[in-house]
Amino acid sequence: GAIDRILALRPDLVISAGDMVAGQRLPHLGTVEVDAMWRAFHAHVSNPLRAAGIPLAVTPGNHDASAYRGFEAERQIYGEQWRQRRPDLEFVDDAGYPYNYAFSHGKVLFVSLDVTTTGALPEAQKQWLARVLAEHGPRYRHRVIFSHVPLWPFTQGREDDFSGDPELEKLLQDAGVGLYLSGHHQAFYPGSKDHVHFVSLACLGAGPRLLIGDGQRSERSIALIEIDGPDLRFAAL
């Protein structure tokens, strides 16, 4: 399975782009049901990674921490789950963990954005990101952003399901962000625009999607990101 492959690769860290459990349902799920899904996720994913000494950095998705009205309880449970499982990372700004936060590894600055809804990023979070990138970004060779909902669309059926925030895009460009990882569109695609790599991550569960303009469904996969000196390499495995 995917976890066995990850354990065999021995990566420096693992990033999850959200939707680790299947919440955001109507009628709303109860706490018992949501907790049971988290227990299963930890048993199959979190615990094996922790036992192997591989940190897991998470970002909220709409199915595990939706910011849409009515899912406040699921969002709170997400926070409780990951505050109890805080990874062994060098945090640069952890006030918003496990939603929006920043950490470093080697010469790379990683920033999680809390993006579980479509439309522009809230102004307060944009200001926070600008401050983190201005204060800490210049110390690192690479700056990597990750969130659930992408900045731009990748797949069929989700053409309108993205943030599309031009102010955020300009902020990334001005701060020299080299890589933006996202989930939600359930297909692997390594693209780039104006010196920023935008990599959409495939899913491991249900619902692989067709890329826009493509007739072939994306396979389930994990993405291997290799950062070697000035170079960034991406592959779906």
Q: Which residue stretches match the model-derived regions?
A:
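N-terminal active-site segment of His-dependent metallophosphoesterases
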Residues: 1-35, 124
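Active-site glycine-centered loops adjacent to acidic/histidine catalytic or metal-binding residues
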Residues: 18-19, 61-62, 148, 183-184
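Extended active-site neighborhood of metal-dependent phosphoesterases/phosphodiesterases
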Residues: 26-141, 167-173, 179, 191-228
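Short acidic, glycine-rich surface-loop motifs adjacent to enzyme active sites
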Residues: 136-155
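Histidine-centered catalytic micro-motifs
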Residues: 145-151, 180-188
